[in-house]
Amino acid sequence: MASPFAETTIEQAVQNLLNEYADCLDNDRLEEWPEHFIEDGCYFVQPRENIDAGLDGGYWMYHTSKAMLRDRVTSLRHINTYNKYYCRHLITNVKVVQQDDENFEANSNFLLVQVNFEGKIDSI
């Protein structure tokens, strides 16, 4: 059995990446956010209910390139301005679950809390 500490360096790097990613979003550095992705990287948000039901698709958001992520930032800055809010991402339990010479897969848990300018709180 491999040591549970064998992946610590990679897990710390993943944790640092996720922290920086969240910091961009939480501190209104939206223009920096797409730089956490490769040019043809995918970003999608799928409702947990769809995953639990075994449904493929039904995404809230589905972006397939860094250019689409930049478009999302433009939309947030200039179009979707009706409901301004502050957000905080809390990320825990980062774990590398699979690794080879060139790639790895990591899982984590997160909680997103949004507070709008009127004081309404949503946790996602």
What are these model-predicted stretches?
Residues 12-15, 46, 98-99, 114:
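Residue-identity detector for glutamine
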Residues 110-116:
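Beta-strand elements of well-folded, non-transmembrane domains
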